[in-house]
A protein has these predicted regions:
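NTP-dependent small-molecule kinase module
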Residues: 13-21, 176-239
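Phosphate-binding P-loop
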Residues: 17-23, 104-105, 388-390
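A glycine- and Lys/Arg-enriched "phosphate-lid" helix/loop adjacent to the NTP-binding pocket
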Residues: 73-87, 130-190
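Active-site-adjacent alpha-helix immediately C-terminal to a catalytic or transition-state-stabilizing loop
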Residues: 314, 382-440
Length: 458
């Protein structure tokens, strides 16, 4: 199913209106190398984009490599006593800011300046330039990491960066540590100076373990700080599945609160076995199964079970051992179809032809009479997403088609227009493993490539 210009124009107009509210925001990252700045940047971009705010990361390191491709950027390039290199780095940071400002003026909403920005001289230059622009607010976001395990992991990940990709690993690590030592010589953390200037900032310690915020103002800044306070990097698995087949699925009706069919109950029983194999309740079964090598979680065997309040998801959880912790929540209910609840698509075409055409043109903002659209679902799922970011144990979520699409769009960073076209079949478990720069997704039978295929009309 292809999107036409007519289809996408509805969403474009909606985004224009949504992004008009409040000033634009620049987030300046601050911190030593390998402290999680890019990790935080990508998490924020994904969260804010999913909420409908145009968000983009501007990485100074990428521009630096292009601007001075003839020079080897080893540790000596970052020595504060290397005047030529220091001048180049400062200029590249300002050039990146110019590109960032130009993008904001052309319709962007949130821009992230991903760099060390570790000296007061650099930060004062950034403040001076961005303060000249009307309707652009800014804040600094410093990532501090003192956990040796996290640091070692971050350093190992740096081996995949363009600066070290073709270098012997041990040589690369030694050079990177020397680079960090050079940064430490000139590093000046956020604090009293920024407060005297009344600059907004947040300091994040050990990727979300602790946060300190100062002068945080406005909706976007507060959302960023709130989100950062709930993230972590612990391993865990998020299982997503739709309810078993319901009577309405069989009859081609939407919404409502129907029971499961016999086929749906068979899936419910199979789902309970699936969970027991991977997260056994009994201590004697604590040893992970062979299948757990693919699907096992980071929660040490503990599994939470979440369902919507609707009958078909509650019935899908019926066969689970009573010792599993079960939470039911309205946030996970299917998109509400208003006056069209319990109708078939043919019925809707006949009774509400104009509303049907509008919704088919763009499901993100189109809705049936008295019902929700996809953006409404995103808004009510925001607390669920934040809770999933906070949760350090594994969780199995039994929910519905549109909610599944919306959650998958968040975790994969999928474009919101593509989200409405995502095929999410019944009786299938998606196993999501959040990683530093994305998410691994697998079915029970192996690795999955999500394809955008013609979906059901719902």
């Amino acid at each position: 199913m292809a999107l036409t210009r007519h289809d996408s124009s509805f969403y474009t107009d909606y985004l224009e209106r949504r992004n008009e509210i409040g000033p634009k925001l620049v987030i300046f990252m601050v911190g030593l190398p390998a402290r999680g700045k890019s990790y935080i940047s990508h998490k924020l971009r994904r969260f804010l984009s999913w909420m409908g705010f145009r968000t983009k990361i501007f990485n100074v390191g990428n521009r630096r490599r292009v601007a001075d491709a003839a020079t080897t950027h080893d540790a000596t390039f970052f020595d504060p006593n290397n005047a030529r290199a220091r001048e180049l780095r400062e200029q590249v940071a300002l050039d990146t800011l110019e590109e960032l400002i130009s993008w904001l003026k052309s319709g962007g909403k949130v821009a992230i300046h991903d760099a060390t920005n570790s000296t007061r001289v650099r930060r004062e230059a950034l403040i001076h330039r961005v303060s000249q622009e009307p309707n652009i607010s800014f804040m600094f976001m410093e990532s501090i990491c003192t956990d040796p395990i996290i640091l070692e992991t971050n350093i190992r990940m740096k081996l995949n960066s363009p600066d070290y990709r073709n270098m012997d690993p041990e040589t690369a690590i030694a050079d990177f540590k020397a680079r960090t030592n050079n940064y430490e010589k000139a590093y000046e953390p956020l604090g009293d100076v920024e407060e005297k200037l009344d600059v907004s900032y947040v300091k994040v310690f050990n990727v979300g373990k602790k946060s300190i915020a100062y002068n945080v103002r406005g909706y976007l800044m507060s959302q960023c700080v709130f989100f950062l306070g709930n993230m972590h990097i612990a391993d865990r698995v998020i299982y997503l599945t739709r309810h078993g087949e319901s009577e309405y699925n069989r009859e081609g009706k939407i919404g409502g609160d129907p029971p499961l069919t016999d086929q749906g109950r068979k899936f419910a029983a199979a789902l309970a076995r699936f969970a027991q194999e991977r997260h056994p309740i009994a201590p004697a079964c604590a040893e992970k199964s062979k299948a757990d090598a693919t699907f096992g979680g980071g929660g040490g065997g503990q599994l939470q079970l979440w369902t919507s309040k609707l009958r078909r998801t509650v019935e899908t959880a019926h066969f689970f051992d009573e010792q599993y912790e079960v939470t039911t929540m309205r946030f996970l209910n299917e998109i509400y179809s208003g006056l069209c609840e319990g109708m078939t698509y043919d019925d809707i075409k006949k009774v509400y032809p104009e509303e049907y055409r509008t919704r088919q043109a763009n499901k993100l903002i189109g809705r049936y009479p008295g019902g929700e659209n996809y953006m409404d679902v995103i808004e009510r799922l925001r607390p669920v997403v934040v809770e999933l970011e906070r949760l350090s144990t594994d969780v199995l979520i039994i929910t519905h088609n549109v909610v599944m699409r919306t959650l998958l769009a968040y975790f994969t960073g999928m474009d919101l227009l593509e989200m409405t076209l995502l095929d999410v079949p019944l009786h299938t478990v998606y196993c999501l493993k959040p990683k530093p720069y994305g998410v691994e997704i697998a079915y029970q039978r192996g690795v999955v490539v999500i394809c955008i295929t013609p979906p059901s009309e719902h």
